[in-house]
Amino acid sequence: MNKLETMDYININKNSWNAKVDYHLKSDFYFVDEFIAGRTSLNEPELELLGDIQGKKILHLQCHFGQDSISLARMGAEVTAVDLSDKAIVEARILAEKCGVDVNFIESNVYDLANVLEEKFDIIFTSYGVIGWLPDLDKWAKVIQHFLKPNGEFIMIEFHPVIWMFDDDFTKIAYDYQSTEPIVETYEGTYADREAN
């Protein structure tokens, strides 16, 4: 993918995520009311990987509207979280305020993060459904390396890539497992609300 194609892809991706935010906030998938009341968004596998994070500096990449970021802060971490979607970051800040939690939310293309952030982190965290949207995993890995303290940890919890072989209805294999192209999805609604327009 050339630079122009990459920027086009990133802008399309940003617009897509901006369009999903309101639907996701209202969906049962994200259980926002329960979350504000104290329910964590983190599942057992990532909680086990994270362990005791009290006082640790964590960078959360591709945070959407911040549920996992806020959950990490509730566990005592000092959290900085980044997302491409400006709308998601606005809503993340509102959600953090409703939860009474302090998180530094940054709106940025993850590849350009070094232009707006200078810190180093004990842990870099990312979760579920993030790598399929990235047009350049090598460049993403360099971002992680740049922000990680010596002896720091990168913790990623992600779906197995075999999931990306299936069609949008998950009924048949439609894509090559070894594909190096970005994923392009065409469907009605969002993964959190299939009725969303």
Model-derived regions: residue spans:
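Conserved class I S-adenosyl-L-methionine
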Residues: 1-54, 67, 153-189
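Class I SAM-dependent methyltransferase SAM/SAH-binding core
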Residues: 57-113
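A short acidic, Gly/Pro-enriched loop at the edge of an enzyme's catalytic core
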Residues: 115-124
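Residues lining the SAM
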Residues: 126-128, 157
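A short His-aromatic
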Residues: 132-133
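A short glycine-rich, Lys/Arg-flanked "PGG" loop and its adjoining helix->strand segment in the class I
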Residues: 138-153
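A conserved mid-domain beta-alpha-beta active-site/ligand-binding segment of alpha/beta enzyme cores
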Residues: 193-197
